[in-house]
A protein has these predicted regions:
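A conserved hydrophobic secondary-structure block that centers on an alpha-helix together
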Residues: 1-11
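Conserved beta-strand positions
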Residues: 1-2, 23-24, 98
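Short acidic/polar capping segments at secondary-structure boundaries
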Residues: 3-5, 27-28, 56-58
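Acidic, His- and aromatic-enriched active-site or binding-groove loops in soluble protein domains
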Residues: 11-52
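A generic short-segment signal for beta-strand/edge and adjacent turn/coil regions
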Residues: 18-22, 65, 101-102
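Active-site and substrate-binding clefts of carbohydrate-active enzymes
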Residues: 37-48, 52-55, 60, 67-70, ...
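Active-site glycine- and acidic-residue-rich loops that bind
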Residues: 74
Length: 214
């Protein structure tokens, strides 16, 4: 799901498609006082489990790693693991989600990002830390949801607003989006793999992103 776009309704649709777990943003305006470091359940279909991104710890790597004005620079693997294991990071599962472009584009090779990532697994798996890695399925199976997550409005990990205005923030992409999806039944009626292929590519989020003015 692009940029972790999620809402109660989207989660219910995903559950109806047969999925049992979904990734979403641990947005403050949705979580409130709750921690992203637990498994949650969809508000409409509680069979769908949710793993929420710890945006602070994720962005420490994705955006702040090479920022020399950051008061925690330089970030080493040992320092980062101390944060993961700290009492100030309570919970059962810490989800670190970031774009692939973090590695090599946002954080170029000369920042030391690749050396950091090579050192991180060994530091995490040190016995004294009592931590382990888990796949999405493993984490969702191991831990029970602590509560339902209510998210009536669509959220994402994009920008400060944590919404979808990065793609649907003005009349131009909004109109393009509406007209595109208005063709759904017509495209389906054609029963043409070629048209299906083209229509699916027209749904690429970047088309709408580059119409944005924010």
């Amino acid at each position: 799901n692009t940029e972790l776009i999620y809402s109660d309704e989207i989660g219910a649709m995903v559950a109806d498609m047969g999925f049992r777990t979904m990734l979403a943003e641990g947005a403050k305006h949705v979580l409130g006082w709750k921690s992203p470091n637990y498994v949650y359940a969809n508000a409409i279909n509680q069979k769908l489990r949710l793993l929420l991104r710890n945006y602070k710890l994720s962005d420490d790597i994705a955006f702040r790693f090479s920022n020399r004005s950051w008061d925690e620079w330089p970030l080493t693997a040992d320092k980062y693991v101390k944060w993961l294991a700290s009492d100030e990071t309570p919970g059962e599962v810490i989800n670190l989600f970031m774009d692939y472009e973090t590695f090599g584009e946002h954080q170029t090779a000369d920042t030391g990002i690749f050396e950091f990532m090579r050192a991180l697994p060994k530091a995490i798996l040190a016995k004294k830390n009592d931590m382990e890695f888990a796949t999405v399925s493993e984490a969702a199976k191991k831990y029970q949801p602590v509560s339902v997550l209510h998210c009536p409005h669509v959220m994402s990990w994009a920008d400060e607003e944590r919404d979808v205005t990065a793609w649907l923030g003005n009349e131009v992409p909004n109109e393009a989006f509406s007209k595109l999806y208005a063709q759904k039944e017509k495209v389906a009626s054609l029963k043409s793999p070629d048209f299906d292929y083209v229509w699916s590519f027209m749904q690429t989020s970047d088309h709408f992103y580059y119409m944005a003015t924010k």
